[in-house]
C-alpha cells in the first residue's frame, strides 16, 4: 500500500540513499545540485523547522521518493521552494508525483506562502510536465540562492491564482 507522510527521524539513512540513487539514475551532476546537499543525510532535522515540511513516499515499508517545501533561501518575501522532489522509477507515471505535489502545495498554502519556486534540469521533461500541469510557469532566471548552480531551469507558481 502506498502512503505519503511527513519524514520521520528514522527515515534519514534510507531516504538519503534513495534520493541519491534516483539522482544517479537520472544523470544529475554531483556538484551544484541536490546530490551534494548535506541536508540529504539529515532530512528530518532539515525540515523540522517552522515553515518547512518534507514528505516521503512509502510503499510496502520502503521509501521510494519524496518532496518538500521550505522558505526560498536568500530571498525576501512569502516565497517557498519545492525541494528535492524525486520519485523512484517504479512509481513514475502512476499519479504519485501529482499526489506528492498536492501535499506540498497544500502545506505551502497553510504556511501562507504566496509563490512556489523550483529549479530542475532541462532533461527532466516528465517532471516539468507535472510542474506545468500543477500551475508552474517558466521564468527567465533563478530566484534566491539555492546553491544549485547546475540547475538551469527555473519555474514559479502563484498560489493566489489557484481555484
Stretch-by-stretch model annotation:
Residues 62, 75-76, 84-102, 110-111, ...:
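Conserved glycine-rich acetyl-CoA-binding loop
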Amino acid at each position: 500500500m502506498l502512503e505519503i507522510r511527513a519524514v520521520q527521524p528514522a527515515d534519514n539513512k534510507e531516504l538519503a540513499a534513495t534520493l541519491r540513487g534516483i539522482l544517479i539514475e537520472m544523470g544529475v551532476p554531483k556538484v551544484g545540485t541536490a546530490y551534494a546537499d548535506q541536508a540529504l543525510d539529515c532530512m528530518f532535522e532539515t525540515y523540522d523547522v517552522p515553515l518547512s515540511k518534507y514528505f516521503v513516499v512509502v510503499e510496502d515499508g520502503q521509501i521510494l521518493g519524496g518532496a518538500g517545501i521550505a522558505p526560498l533561501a536568500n530571498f525576501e518575501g512569502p516565497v517557498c521552494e519545492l525541494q528535492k522532489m524525486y520519485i523512484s522509477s517504479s512509481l513514475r507515471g502512476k499519479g504519485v508525483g501529482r499526489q506528492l505535489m498536492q501535499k506540498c502545495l497544500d502545506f505551502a498554502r497553510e504556511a501562507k506562502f504566496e509563490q512556489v519556486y523550483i529549479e530542475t534540469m532541462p532533461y527532466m521533461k516528465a517532471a516539468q510536465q507535472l510542474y506545468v500541469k500543477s500551475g508552474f510557469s517558466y521564468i527567465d532566471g533563478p530566484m534566491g540562492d539555492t546553491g544549485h548552480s547546475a540547475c538551469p531551469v527555473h519555474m514559479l507558481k502563484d498560489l493566489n491564482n489557484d481555484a
